[in-house]
Amino acid sequence: MTMHPLSLACLLGMAICTSAHATDVAAASAVPQATALPTIEIHADTQNGFHSAAPVQTDKSDTPLAQTPLSITVVRRALLDSQQSLTLVDALHNVSGVVANTYGRRGWDDLIIRGQTASDALFVDGLRTAGSNRVAEQLFGMQQVEVLKGPASLLYGQVLPGGLVNLISKRPGTEPMRRVDLGLGSDGLRQGSLDLNQPLSANSKAALRLTALAMNSDDPTEHVYFRSRWIAPALALDLGERTDFVLLTSYQERDYIRQQGLPWEGSVDPNRNGRIDRALFTGEPGQTPYHSHQSRLSYVLDHRFDNGWSLHHAARWQAFGLDGLLIASNGLAPDLRTLRRTGMQQAFDGRTWVQDTYLQGDFLTGSWQHTLTAGADAFKTWEWNVQSTCQVGTLNVYAPVYGRPIVCPTTPSRDTLNVVASGGAYLRDRIQFAPDWQLLLGLRHDLSHNRSEDRGAGAQTRNDTNATTGSAALMFDTGGGVHPYASVATSFYPNVGTDVQGATFGPEHGRQVELGAKMEVGASTSLSVALYDLRRRNVLQNDPLHDGYSIAVGEQRSRGVELNAAADLGSGLSLFGGYAYTDAVVTDDGGQRISSVGQRLNNVPRHSGSLWLQYAAHGAADGWSISGGARAEGEKSAYGHRIPGYMVFDAGLAYRQRHWHYALNLKNAFDHDYFTGGLQRAVALGDPRTLLFSVGVDY
């Protein structure tokens, strides 16, 4: 199915108009009732709905989201629970301008923001992660997901210009809470989780929280499976009324055989032999599964001085490991039925230390009100990578016979150590220079040291860089809840590694200009629109002539528009949706022999979007809720192939009775066959119809 180019935009537009009108009507009709009887239920809906007006951690300020001249989308826990989202990919399907799961069910977090790769831009509690997407994040342990779109180097340093994803961990609370959930689903999904919170002091400021999860699941593809174990104790200490201190820890183990997609011919492209079965496994049933583990130990300290200034300090130590055998498609033979395969025995081992510290305070210069943020951050990461290229026999994709030998050499083809150390200082001033005008100015300087060591060859390369980046934004308050703004921001990202000649790469630089507007309708509806032009220069891509090496191309450009809506409309109705138009192309290929100027960037649809509605019943049907929505992507291209667009529909039904919670969700309700993206020699499969059922109890 090819999505009509503007169908989702029209759908979202109608939803936005409906939400704005419904909010006005609901507000007008609710005033007498709210005045006469301000019930706790209304407050609970506000706290647990889809809409978020509160300040976000990603902005490093206490400014309400509608008054922030940045494109930030917040996916709250209420929306995640309504959809029974199990993975970060599930959560990001709700965010306009984000393309998730481009490489299918391979066990990693793959994402693109505003047309630019962002898999290395994953943050947890405001601190960068190690190895980024190689160990998939555990969504159950997160309270909400914040996505900052556009260059974020001012506050976060070395970040690719498309944006970043910041996951906010569940933290100890002030109320006792114990919850256990059990879940079952399609393809043998079995999941159990617990979430416990216990105050430890009379004022409940000291508290302990424990979250844990165990999950086993098979896959629509034969021989593919996923096993996950995760636990996260967190401790809040009472260090006085002016100081907050939280210790956050987690440990995760995952074992899986990844889904590697299918050959292009016979799936997306025609094949004279017919269609290839979507359940085909292109690896070997006896291959070594992937095993990954990840440990985190972090703390967050916030102190409020008596002069109105505040100090924030956070740090984390993280270790991860990943090893396993990859069997990948190497293309079909001329008979278009014999799949040539290659194997890669992989082992990654990484360590990361990261910290961020900043002071923040308000002061006046004449009639101008300033909010100044001055900070410094640093990180150091070590990553060892050992790989061996293995020989694997061919496979008849129409009549597969498994059991071919896998021959791996005793000497690895790659044995490298990469060390990245970086530090930066930043300064941001939010200036209210008139009652309705604010100006945001920021400047940052980074120093970066990268060292790559080829332990097999005994060679070593160094790449030391420094860069100054910044941002500026102007926002106007119209007085009617509408806040138009204009902004410009730059980014910096050091390129690691060498080309086939052994030469190091210069750093990437990005720049974005954005025009937008944010609107608050009442207290529980927010709408936003953003138009942007983003340029990314000196971008690394795979060398088309030398496998395993990279080249730097001249420039990529993304232009687009994004619409967003989040609303809790009263009477139990909530809405969350977004639409994006993204035009992402190569504008300068650096003079490559085979020109790519004008080509669309891989796996980026021009049109994409989603919409989710939920209705929580009252009166005789109190406790029941029903939800549903759609998510869609238009046609996109990948490595010279066309991937058709799609639209899939999801639905949910939930019931709550005192301490018991029941939820039933159906994803891809009409079992539409679709594809999410592609690699050079394989196309990634979308998820078929999936049924999820869960039961939980509070005690």
Each model region followed by its residue ranges:
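Face-selective signature of the C-terminal outer-membrane beta-barrel domain
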Residues: 297-320, 341-454
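Structural signature of Gram-negative outer-membrane beta-barrels, strongest in the C-terminal barrel
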Residues: 236-240, 350, 369-381, 416-536, ...
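Acidic, small-polar-rich N-terminal luminal/periplasmic segments of exported/outer-membrane proteins
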Residues: 31, 35-176, 180, 515, ...
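Gram-negative outer-membrane beta-barrel transporters
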Residues: 436, 533, 552-639, 694-698
